[in-house]
């Protein structure tokens, strides 16, 4: 049974609030340090402001000038506005530079269409006429364009698996994310007794595979959509609803450690060597 849309929206808001707060706490250390940092052997004083923005661009995996940011202090002053635009709330939302409103809506529709059509081609024959994208996921896709997880972008991109890379096809063509039941059995790593009729891999990352699988435990059970995560460090996680996924995923591989200013290095941060 699908979750009510209001429950999905509330769980997403709680997820975003938690991750935003954690990232803001880290940026309250990084931003003031970078705003006054001066590298060794600076040849031109006029370059330092550009270096500071470059360092923040690397930390946040973005181009701050595209967002109208010209001074490091604006990141904290405008945090609530900027967080969803650069993924500091753990989501991906397409921005204006990625197309007009109509073009972005078309990208979203294309993602769902291609996934569903591929499911009907690659799933077990006895479910091909009835299989469709789970309503929970469709509701989530109406609110954001991706769910990418915990941490500042530069660190998250290296070490944190994304639950859903989103509507972009630059990482992998959408149809390529949909797998045959045989391939999903290995990818999702469900117990051998489980049966998989179809599904897809919305996201992945270091030592972790996310899967959305149409599955059942035995012939007597009905087919259900489930969200799974198979990892080396956390084993296998199985969820039946998006609110459960978001509540767990918000804390997945969470680290509360924030460096002190004395642990930061100006050259490393300003020259994008993080």
Stretch-by-stretch model annotation:
Residues 123-127:
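Exposed regions on extracellular, virion, or secretory-pathway luminal proteins
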């Amino acid at each position: 049974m699908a979750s009510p849309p209001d429950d999905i929206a509330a769980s997403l808001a709680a997820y975003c609030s938690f991750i935003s707060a954690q990232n803001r706490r880290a940026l309250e250390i990084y931003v003031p340090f970078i705003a006054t940092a001066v590298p060794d052997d600076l040849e031109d004083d006029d370059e330092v402001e550009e270096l500071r923005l470059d360092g923040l661009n690397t930390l946040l995996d973005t181009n701050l000038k595209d967002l109208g940011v010209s001074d490091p202090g604006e990141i904290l002053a405008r945090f609530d506005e900027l967080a969803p635009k650069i993924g500091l709330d753990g989501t991906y939302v397409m921005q204006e530079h990625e197309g007009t409103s109509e073009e972005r809506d078309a990208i979203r529709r294309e993602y769902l269409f291609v996934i569903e059509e591929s499911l009907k081609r690659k799933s077990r024959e006895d479910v091909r006429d009835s299989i469709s994208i789970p309503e929970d996921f469709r509701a989530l896709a109406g609110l954001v364009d991706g769910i990418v997880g915990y941490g500042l972008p530069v660190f998250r991109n290296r070490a944190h698996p994304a639950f859903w890379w989103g509507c972009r096809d630059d990482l992998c063509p959408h149809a390529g994310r949909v797998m045959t039941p045989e391939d999903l059995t290995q990818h999702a790593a469900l117990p051998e007794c489980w049966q998989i009729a179809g599904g897809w891999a919305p996201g992945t990352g270091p030592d972790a595979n996310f899967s959305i699988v149409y599955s059942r435990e035995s012939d007597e059970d009905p087919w259900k959509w489930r969200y799974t995560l198979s990892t080396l460090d956390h084993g296998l996680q199985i969820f039946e609803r998006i609110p459960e996924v978001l509540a767990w995923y918000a804390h997945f591989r969470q680290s509360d450690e924030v460096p002190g200013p004395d642990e930061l290095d100006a050259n490393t941060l300003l020259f994008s060597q993080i």
